[in-house]
Amino acid sequence: MDIKVHVRESDEDAYVVELGGEIDVYTSPKVKDAITELIDQGHYNLVINLEKVRYIDSTGLGVLIGGLKRVREHGGTVNLVCTNPQIKKIFDITGLVKIFGIFDDEQGAKKALAS
């Protein structure tokens, strides 16, 4: 069980958090730390790219929801990039498609932040 986390600044006044691997009870703290660090630095518009994520459990979903809640307190938002049908299904079943912007590509997710 591993997770790769890469954070980069985007040209749309947003930060992109690229994740790869599995987001579960063991790897979620690393994801939470990356998101928390951005928020603590005053970055409230985030794109979390899940294209390379193979698996996410309830702990991982909780980290994403927690991040969204924190950025919304500052007028920001979190958009997700998700192309894996199994991961998309989890967001659909849990109803999280109603609270997250979920996009098929990073460009669309970043563009939606700007509007």
Model-found features: residue ranges?
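Extracellular glycan-recognition surfaces and repeat-rich motifs
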Residues: 1
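STAS-typified acidic loop motif
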Residues: 4-33
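Conserved catalytic submotifs in the C-terminal HATPase_c
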Residues: 11-12, 51, 107
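Amphipathic alpha-helical interaction surfaces in cytosolic regulatory modules
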Residues: 23-100
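Acidic phosphotransfer microenvironment of two-component signaling modules
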Residues: 85, 107-108
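Short acidic-hydrophobic, aromatic-tinged amphipathic segments that line or gate anion-handling sites
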Residues: 101-105
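A short, charged, amphipathic alpha-helix used as a generic interaction element across diverse proteins
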Residues: 109, 113-115
